[in-house]
Structures are given as structure tokens and as C-alpha cells.
Amino acid sequence: MAEYKLGEIEMKFAELIWENEPIQSGELALLSLKELNWKRTTTYTVLKRLCDKGIFKNEKGMVSSLLSKQLFQAKQSEEFVEGTFGGSLPDFVAAFISQKKLSEEEIEELKRIIEGK
């Protein structure tokens, strides 16, 4: 199973890509300088790392995602539930709601999701 853990800085960089894709790698380097205060070499190093993880691709200088942000978050969540709760979604939900009271709207939304509506 691939590992979908990103550090805080990697996640900010991934957000930049998702918000601007497809994007030329040179343009991404300029955006990273502006938004993250990164040098070009830092941008390319982190980009390569995220490409090696299978999240993004850089083909002929054009950067785009292999995983949408939503799919990436789903895979992160699955990995977390598997590692922390032995894959038990009910155990995860029980732990979550024991710390946070859900509103009626949230409960109804969860019911719709579970029922596939």
C-alpha cells in the first residue's frame, strides 16, 4: 500500500498544485517563491518527492495530479482508520463523536452518505 502521509509544508505545496493545475513547472517554481518563499531547487525537490509518491506527475515540464485532492484525502483517511482503529470505521466514528457533538444537519448528512443518496 502506498503511503499518503504529507508533512505540513508538503501539504501546502500540494494545495498549490491542486489549485493551479495543470501548471508549467517553471510557473510552479515562481508561485512557490511567492507563496512559500521557496527557491527553485526546493520546489523541484519537493515536487519530485510527491511525484515519487504517485500523487502528481511532471511530464515535459507540465505538472498535474494523478490523484485528485478528494481521492488523496480519502486514501489518507483510509490509511488513518486502518492504522489507528484496525480498519474499523464504526470504532473511528464512535471515537470521533465521543469528542464532538454532531448537529442534526450533520447526522442527516451522514445518514445520506451511508445510504448512498
Which positions does each model-derived feature cover?
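Short acidic, hydrophobic short linear motifs in intrinsically disordered regions
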Residues: 22-32
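Short helix-to-turn junction characteristic of helix-turn-helix DNA-binding domains
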Residues: 17-21
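Amphipathic alpha-helical dimerization/coiled-coil segments
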Residues: 78-116
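Short, hydrophobic-biased segments on the C-terminal half of alpha helices
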Residues: 44-48
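A short, conserved structural fragment
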Residues: 51-61
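Minor-groove-contacting beta-hairpin "wing" of winged helix-turn-helix DNA-binding domains
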Residues: 61-68
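Short alpha-helical segments that sit at the start of domains
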Residues: 1-16, 71-72, 83
